[in-house]
Amino acid sequence: MAEPFNECNLGAHATPDFIHYNRLKAWKAQDSSFPFINAHDTTYNVRDNSNWEYTLKPRLRARLRNSKNIILILSENTKESRALREEIKYGIGELGLPVIVVYPDLSNSQIGNGNSPGYMAKKYWDKLPSLKKLIESVPSVHVPLSKDKITQALNDNDFTIQHKISNYCWRYHD
């Protein structure tokens, strides 16, 4: 994602990671039992050219305060924009929100084996220095972009702020 949004007419929604995010929204629209709750719906929408300090950053923080966890899409196209860096630093670093990391480009075996992240997953963390620094401070589950795997992770109370388990819990669902 560009700083903070893509400049084309479609804005952020044209970036590859937002296409994956829109897939989550489509799954929810097609299946009401899909447990995805879109935090962006908890505050009013803002324009891509809104002021960062007075509009975008406060909306992002309000959304995070209303969240039980963070779903982070981490792909070969992910870039650490100002907005993503703020989401990670505030959501993980200050609020302690558990993270569900979704890897659209990786299989279960590339993501990790049981309680240890795999080489490829760790390589993707290099794209987000703020995540790499903070990921061990909260519970996290790592899954491929699969409706079943994401459903499993979202339904797991261990990865919600209300019931979170110990920090640095590397596990994903087979």
Q: What is the predicted role of each segment?
A:
Residues 24-26, 85-88, 114-117:
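Short, glycine/charged-enriched secondary-structure capping and boundary segments
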Residues 10-16, 20, 24, 95-98, ...:
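Internal hydrophobic scaffold segments of catalytic domains
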Residues 1-66, 159-174:
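Conserved N-terminal substructure of TIR/SEFIR domains
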